[in-house]
């Protein structure tokens, strides 16, 4: 049994480069599906009711938040549905192609939190029938995990950012979460890239 564990541990270590890329790409597919679903017929018509329903049963101190968003979304639901769909598709493309990852991950955290706090109603209201806290907060944590992976392992050679960085080094400021280890070492980061 111990040899199986050692084999699996070694497999993960040997394939860390492709695994971190696979996580990013699969997450991009999830965001692409989310974004595409926003363009289905009837979604814009149902958004105001979804936001209104999210406010039902929430604590009194949250009612102004949901009241504001319910009124705002009701004024032009098509605009909000299209905007959210386009933002989700933009995040999806950035994840799929590994483009502007630092900006995409940061924007993804904020977009996920907006989705979690408005149409998902912070995952609540919480009571005996509650089964989860909503997907938006989990998405935000995945984006934070991708930031940690990028800071820990550096550039991903299976990304559009990597190709751009090879021609234009300044792109690193847009694309990479720089760790203290890689920012102080001018040549070490490219040597580490070869391993990943």
Annotate each language-model stretch with its function:
Residues 1-87, 97-196:
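Extended, low-polarity transmembrane helix blocks
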């Amino acid at each position: 049994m111990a040899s199986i564990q050692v084999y699996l541990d070694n497999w993960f270590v040997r394939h860390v480069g492709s695994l971190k890329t696979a996580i990013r790409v699969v997450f991009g597919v999830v965001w692409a599906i989310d974004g595409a679903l926003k363009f289905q017929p009837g979604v814009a018509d149902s958004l105001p009711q979804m936001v209104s329903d999210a406010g039902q049963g929430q604590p009194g101190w949250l009612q102004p938040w949901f009241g504001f968003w319910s009124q705002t979304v009701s004024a032009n639901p098509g605009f909000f549905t299209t905007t959210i769909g386009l933002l989700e598709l933009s995040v999806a493309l950035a994840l799929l192609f590994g483009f502007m990852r630092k900006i995409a991950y940061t924007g993804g955290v904020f977009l996920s939190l907006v989705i979690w706090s408005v149409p998902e109603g912070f995952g609540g209201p919480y009571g005996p029938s509650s089964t989860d806290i909503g997907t938006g907060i989990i998405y935000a944590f995945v984006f934070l995990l991708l930031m940690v992976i990028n800071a820990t392992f550096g550039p991903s050679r299976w990304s559009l950012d990597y190709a751009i960085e090879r021609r234009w080094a300044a792109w690193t400021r847009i694309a990479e979460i720089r760790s203290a280890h890689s920012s102080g070492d001018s040549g070490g980061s490219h040597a580490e890239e070869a391993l990943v």
